[in-house]
């Protein structure tokens, strides 16, 4: 049943491989004002806590202090029904596997249905942690208004063929040749300490996802809005289910000439200035609706099953630990991974060969 305001706050433990070190310092930066209480939720970031009503795992369980592959095992202090996994990578990069997914009561994901064999999937954007460089509180009160330059992008030198990295890299390099004013940041290009440097001084930002599927928009778009930029965007096909149409300019990077003309026209006719109200609204949506903890603070109470019945104490294992302890299951996971990778490759091929 949905959580009631009359009850005590739900205590939700949050674990993440991405925040294995110093989670109590790192994760509160993504909470409004750094407060652990948000709506009906009290967030718990202590990895050894055993007093909680819910467990949320972001991508995978944390690394153990010795480092290397995650050996973490979490002895549940709540019913398995009150657990949630958030997938943080597309199907072209990570296959979570049926057995790992089965450990959780719910899965929040932007992966395709055929990649998530689970009875309770929630297909949505996943509130992926942003790389913008400012805390939630800092971003909320500091809209970048001093824009000195036109256009930037952040693009690594990755050129994997099984994802859209290679297409993104090729498009970016070609665009730089046509538009020398494009500032390219990232590994293999111009170094930055923080993504703020690549966003705050610029009016426009080229944001290209490495995967194309519904609901899959990432920090590449969220960071752009947080930096107060107008995105030239390629990625999530239903992005306008989330943001106002005036808040971004979609591109099809398979058509370079049309994309180049779209970018030049937008800059020439000052689209940034005319679309500024929509950018403000998109930025508000990121901070208040789609950011990880505000989003979860609404979702978890709606999923909550309150029970006073005793429940069997169970264990959730990291992906690595599960495969290590279930060698036969690991073989089946390898087969599952191969099958999903083939499906992802077919999907990519169909997308690249589809009419423009």
Question: Where would I find each of the regions flagged by the language model?
Answer:
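Conserved active-site histidine-acidic residue motif and adjacent donor-binding/catalytic loop
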Residues: 187-197
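Pol beta-like nucleotidyltransferase catalytic core
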Residues: 2-86, 98-183, 196-205, 214-356
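Short Ser/Thr-rich beta->loop micro-motif in glycosyltransferases that lines
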Residues: 208-210
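A short, histidine- and acid-enriched strand-loop-helix "catalytic/donor-clamping" loop
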Residues: 87-94
